[in-house]
Curated annotation (Swiss-Prot):
The gene is lysC. Residues 267-344, 345-405 form the ACT domain. PROSITE patterns: ACT, ASPARTOKINASE. This is Aspartokinase. It comes from the Bacteria. It catalyses: L-aspartate + ATP = 4-phospho-L-aspartate + ADP.
Length: 405
């Protein structure tokens, strides 16, 4: 059975930990599995390399920065390969390019286009453990590219799909996916299995175990995911399509988890000209700046004017200001509020149960938490609230949906 294992920066964070990873990999080999390993740079190394590159330019060339930051994964993959050989097993490290990962030419945020698995397959047939540098690939010209935040997870999922691996194991420093952040709610429970769609919502709403790009790709390629702790042998969380859940579930939980995202800002535009096409123009301008808009509320127009509120990622405020400059003359005022948080309730059971939203709203009202904005999907309800109530809201909702049981 072929397994792809990915180890993150914390798991690879020291010489001792790299030896620990080698032992974990060899445990799988002992069970009779073929193993392809994808590794991140050692903890803190990517940030160190980024800062190093910035010493030479206030506006660093993206191509050159990709060449610098990609070194971190090359070092960790070579180190793990040597550790595996020390313990008596044939191993070889490959860069993203050597592993056949072809990407677009968007330096620092490239997209994987295809993977030529020939070399990896040949090495596996020769009984090698193949250790691949995550987070990177090469474009059609052979230029080194990096995949952006969470790129090593993306590398692992893409490789698992291309190799038709039985399983893709993502090793981190937590035991799996929890009903909410255990640092906020100590009664949070580990989830044994969760659907791609639920995980995608939790990831996009701020859950840190997996990023949504990786979950999206896993769903697209039907890659079975497991998130595990590299420092113990807990079962972790299985992430699959609903139809592939293991065992019989008496009833799908209405709510699977509560996610908190504090990296949000609210943009409030008052007195905007109320005419056909104004919203299309505003959001079109934001799209040109690649600004990701989430929650949107527009009031009913009166006296030829309307109010428009929406949320963005906090780090994109300056780009948003630039994008909206041409519209300032067409509104009375604009305000940016960073003191907000988004709390999301996620669960596939919402599709077949009514009243989920009212339970949340009543519970928040009881704690005097005011809701500023609301957005919903088939399996998610998100509310925007004052950031000072963020953690209280998480605990309240976790309790009201009995996720601690």
């Amino acid at each position: 059975m072929l397994i792809v294992q990915k180890y993150g920066g914390t798991s690879m964070g020291s010489i001792e930990r790299i030896h620990n990873v080698a032992q974990r990999v060899l445990e799988s080999v002992t069970l009779g599995h073929q193993v392809v390993v994808v590794v991140s740079a050692m903890s803190g190394e990517t940030d160190r390399l980024l800062e190093f590159g910035k010493n030479f330019s206030h506006n660093p060339n993206k191509r050159e920065m990709d060449r610098i930051v990609s070194v971190g994964e090359l070092v960790s993959s070579a180190a793990l390969s040597m550790a595996l050989e020390r313990y008596g097993h044939r191993a070889i490290s490959l860069s993203g390019k050597e592993a056949g990962i072809l990407t677009s030419s968007h330096f620092q945020n490239a997209v994987i286009q295809s993977i030529d698995t020939k070399r990896i397959t040949e090495l596996l047939e020769k009984n090698y453990i193949v250790v691949i540098a995550g987070f990177q690939g090469a474009d059609i010209q052979g230029e080194t590219t990096t995949l952006g935040r969470g790129g090593s997870d993306l590398s692992a999922v893409a490789l698992a799909g291309a190799l038709k691996a039985h399983l893709c194991e993502i090793y981190t420093d937590v035991d799996g996916v929890y009903t909410t952040d255990p640092r906020i709610e100590e009664k949070a429970q580990k989830i044994a299995q969760i659907s791609y769609d639920e995980m995608l919502e939790l990831a996009s709403m701020g859950a840190k175990v997996l990023l949504n790009r990786s979950v999206e790709l896993a769903k697209k390629l039907s890659v079975k995911l497991v998130t595990r702790n590299s420092f113990n042998h807990s079962e972790g969380t299985l992430i699959v399509a609903e139809k592939d859940f293991k065992g019989e579930r008496m009833e799908t939980p209405i709510v699977s988890g509560i996610a908190l995202d504090k990296n949000q800002a609210r943009v409030s535009m008052e007195g905007v000209e109320d005419r056909p096409g104004i919203a299309a123009e505003i959001f079109g301008a934001l799209a040109e700046y690649r600004i990701n808009v989430d929650m949107i509320v527009q009031t009913i127009g009166r006296d030829g004017k309307t109010d428009l509120d929406f949320t963005i990622v906090k780090t994109q405020i300056e780009e948003t200001k630039q994008a909206l400059k041409p519209f300032l003359a067409q509104m009375d005022s604009i305000d940016y509020d960073e003191n907000i948080a988004k709390v999301s309730i996620v669960g596939v059971g919402m599709k077949s149960h009514s009243g989920v939203a009212s339970i949340a709203f009543k519970a928040l009202a009881k704690d005097n938490i005011n809701i500023m904005m609301i957005s919903t999907s088939e399996i998610k309800i998100s509310v925007l609230i004052d950031i000072k109530y963020a953690e209280l809201a998480v605990r309240t909702l976790h309790a009201v949906y009995q996720l601690d049981q």
